[in-house]
Amino acid sequence: MHAMTFAHRILGFAAGALLLAGCGGGNAIAPGQTSLLPPGIARGAHTNRAESWMAPEATGEDLLYVSDADGVVDVFSYPAGKLVGVLKGFASPAGLCSDPDGNVFVTDINNLNVLKYKHGGKKPIQTLVDFGHYPFGCAVDPGTKNLAVANYASTLSFGPGSVSVFVGGKGEPHSYEDQTFNAYFFCGYDSQGNLFVDGADYGSYHTQFAELAKNSSTLTNITLNQTIGYPGGVQWDGKYMAVQDAYTHTIYRFSFSGSSGTSMGAVHIKGDESGLLAQFWIDGKTVVLPYGTQARAVHSVGFWPYTKGGNHSQSFTVAHATELVGVTVSLAKK
């Protein structure tokens, strides 16, 4: 297995790409913008897991987990932002997700697996092997406890990615592919157990969006009525599916009917100048997002009002951060 390289992760596109909705179920990626997955993913840090630590009080607090592509996941009290732990031993941690029990899942791209941690735990309690794929985003269905993983690419000649679903959050995954996708980025379950995933087509000319309906074995392309310049995070917000446009710093809220998605509103995020892809996380009336105040650097975490958007209401800088990628909020059992 060859580790992902910087060149593989450049999702370039022609300057003449059209900003038109929905050819083949996707939207054109905006011209003039070269979006990159975080540079740290190529490094393959392999930090020592034995060096992980967690403050004793962490198990009783709500926690914010933040992945750094250089091989660690920082853990903060939420919403105070006090560092209470650091998880180590990853090659290249990326997308994060959590379940209603407070368990946290960390995709580790170059290790081809997803690690599960108890709320406030410093050692993984489960390793889910995603062999043959580079996992990037993840989501948990609260009803079935199925874990879905958006695989950026396959390890075989760096071929097209896929979606892996670990039924009940264990065992070997079921794999799903869509011929219009090349790279898969993020995914999210709605309240009915339907899975939605975004990504890009061959050459990264268009954003792609698809649904794996509950109990279905086929990904169905979804045509969105709103252009997505560059696909980012996907998460259910309690009413609509929130889909991030990393190019315009906007989170759109979609409802779906058949193979069509209709935007029901937009949340504009101000203050991010990094130009890099990072995952958001919605917690009630707050959306949390890693961001940067200068190009190609994501070293801070901000909280924005959801669904008002605008300027962040709170932020903090992560000490010694290399390139922040994903976030998730894990709630303590009360």
Give residue spans per PLM region.
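Short loop/turn segments immediately following the C-termini of beta-strands
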Residues: 68-69, 109, 152-154, 200-202, ...
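Bacterial signal peptide processing site
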Residues: 24-27
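Blade-level signature of beta-propeller repeat domains, shared across WD40, Kelch, NHL, RCC1
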Residues: 299-334
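A short beta-strand motif characteristic of beta-propeller blades
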Residues: 41-44, 82-88, 123-129, 171-178, ...
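An edge-strand/N-cap motif at the start of beta-rich repeat modules
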Residues: 32-86
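Beta-rich, blade/repeat-based domains predominating
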Residues: 40-61, 89-101, 131-146, 150-154, ...
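Short loop/turn segments that connect beta-strands within beta-propeller blades
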Residues: 77-81, 117-122, 167-171, 212-217, ...
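C-terminal motif of bacterial Sec signal peptides marking the signal peptidase cleavage site
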Residues: 20-22
